[in-house]
Structures are given as structure tokens and as C-alpha cells.
């Protein structure tokens, strides 16, 4: 699992007025909660961009002037019009205890259905899994080679050692859809058999 270090400054003032003042200075108000006490702090918005605007998932190391806390992003709030990050909630990670995190999905292989004209569609870009920090991969690699036209891979079909899926088992991960070209190829194949 990838790690990212962010410098965090503890907040001394709280409330809407203090949060707006922090945003004007290029800082983003944040909370850290979980086991232990809740901590309110600010992080530089430019540093936070490397975490927010990427498909990757990270274990974040929050550096409070030498004291490091490990965490994952739980929730991010954006401004409704501008793409400005307003607030981030972090959840504390403790070594030896499982953590739930959304991991990106990467498809590998060339599906059989695509070879005859079907179209591969990725339905879920990220899946929520639960596992120990040392067992978490950077991404979930799904082999689509055996997929035929009209077939779907569901979360319940996937198995990764040391990971438990939090995303419901009935959630579709990817599918090979029927296209006009594949329908035409199937019809031609049927006529050839007669």
C-alpha cells in the first residue's frame, strides 16, 4: 500500500469564521477520529491535491511536528461550484487492526467477448475492502480473459487473500456488453451452422 506524508498543524480556533480564515490562507480544515481522541487540524491545500485528485488510495502519515499518526481518508467535502476542497475527515489506523479503505480496480487480459465484437465496461472504479494494513495492495487486479459477451464479474466472484469485501457481493465490477457488431457476428455464426 502506498504511503503519503502530510504536514498537519493543530487548530487553535474553531467554528465557521476560523475555517473560512484558514481557507483564505490556503489551508484545509480537517478532523482525525477513531481510536483515541479526536484531533482538529489544518493541512496545506497544495499538499492535499496529491491525495485528493488521484485514482490511487493511500495510507496517510499525518506529521504533527514530529508526532506521526497513520490514517485513511473517510470523507471529503467540496465546494458546490468551485472544485475547492472544503473539509477532509481522516480515520486513524492502528497497526494490527483491520481498516476499511476504497481501492482502485484495474482490469487485465483480453476478454473473449471483446475479441468477437463485445465492449468491456468497467462498472466500479473502486471497491471498499477491509484488511490489515500490511495485506492491502495498491490496486485490485481483476482478470477479464474468460468473460464472454453478456457476462458480468460481480464482487462476490472476487477473492483476494487477507481481504474482506465491504462492497456488497451483488455489485457489478465489469461486464462485456453486446454491441451491434457482436450481434451481427453472432447472427452470421448461427447462419453458418445451419
List each language-model region with its residue ranges.
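Acidic, negatively charged sequence tracts
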Residues: 1-194
Amino acid at each position: 500500500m502506498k504511503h503519503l506524508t502530510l504536514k498537519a498543524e493543530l487548530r487553535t480556533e474553531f467554528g465557521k469564521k476560523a475555517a473560512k480564515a484558514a481557507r483564505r490562507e490556503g489551508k484545509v480544515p480537517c478532523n482525525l477520529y477513531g481510536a483515541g481522541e479526536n484531533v482538529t487540524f489544518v493541512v496545506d491545500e497544495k499538499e492535499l491535491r496529491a491525495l485528493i485528485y488521484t485514482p490511487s488510495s493511500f495510507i496517510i502519515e499525518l506529521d504533527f511536528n514530529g508526532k506521526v499518526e497513520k490514517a485513511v481518508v473517510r470523507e471529503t467535502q467540496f465546494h458546490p461550484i468551485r472544485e475547492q476542497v472544503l473539509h477532509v475527515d481522516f480515520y486513524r489506523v492502528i497497526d494490527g487492526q483491520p481498516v476499511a479503505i476504497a481501492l482502485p480496480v484495474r482490469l487485465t487480459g483480453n476478454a473473449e467477448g471483446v475479441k468477437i465484437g463485445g465492449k468491456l465496461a468497467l462498472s466500479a472504479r473502486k471497491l471498499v475492502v477491509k484488511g490489515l494494513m500490511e495485506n492491502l495492495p495498491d490496486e485490485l487486479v481483476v482478470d477479464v480473459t474468460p468473460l464472454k459477451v453478456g457476462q458480468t464479474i460481480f464482487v462476490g466472484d472476487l477473492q483476494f487473500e487477507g481481504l474482506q469485501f465491504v462492497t456488497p457481493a451483488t455489485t457489478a465490477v465489469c461486464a462485456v456488453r453486446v454491441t451491434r457488431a457482436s450481434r451481427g457476428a453472432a447472427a452470421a455464426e448461427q447462419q453458418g451452422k445451419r
